[in-house]
Regions:
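Alpha-helical adaptor scaffolds
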Residues: 55-68, 75-116
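Alpha-helical segment of the N-proximal tetratricopeptide repeat
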Residues: 16-53, 59-62
Length: 175
């Protein structure tokens, strides 16, 4: 029944495009909140035949991930970023889904791509530093901590990573 609602909204004007997108997201998110992400994916698929919009692709990826389809969600994010290279959220979601899928190498690669796009992304660099550390990649963790420090993030947590990996140099440097 609810899927028929989307067909009635079909039009080519910008206002109608936004109405399709908003209506679709509202309906699909209702399905997701009810624990029915497979129906949300159906809503997004139908909406995408009527309105090509980055918000639909992004939310569809979330619904795929809700089903544990991390590879599909990752591939959708990668393809969507190619179409919408200004939406860095696709790369961030792709990194998250790779991490959830246990693909550490893929996760590291995508995080580095994000940092090429925005070298001052504190959250991504910190998460990457922590992931390197958890995976016994000491040099890589140290390098990320050093970049953060040099960017002006002279925080105790960053200092702890620096001191952990190069104690001779950092033990005498205080905040």
């Amino acid at each position: 029944m609810a899927l028929l609602c989307l067909c009635a909204c079909r039009s080519t004007s910008g206002t109608d495009h936004d109405q399709i997108v908003r209506t679709s997201i509202d309906l699909a998110e209702t399905y997701r909140s009810q624990g029915r992400p497979e129906l949300a994916v159906e809503v997004y698929d139908r909406a995408l035949t009527q309105a090509d919009d980055y918000r639909l692709y992004y939310n569809k990826a979330l619904a795929l991930a809700d089903q544990g389809l991390y590879t599909d969600a990752t591939e959708l994010c990668a393809a969507s970023f190619e179409r919408y290279p200004y939406v860095i959220s696709f790369k961030k979601a792709q990194a998250l889904f790779l991490d959830l899928a246990g693909d550490k190498d893929g996760y590291f690669d995508v995080c580095l791509e994000i940092l090429e796009l925005n070298p001052y992304d504190f959250d991504t660099r910190t998460e990457l530093m922590e992931a390197y550390s958890e995976n016994d990649m000491d040099k890589e963790a140290y390098d990320q901590a050093l970049i953060l420090w040099n960017q002006g993030y002279m925080l105790d947590t960053i200092h702890q990573y620096l001191e952990k990996y190069n104690p001779e140099y950092w033990e005498n440097i205080s905040l």
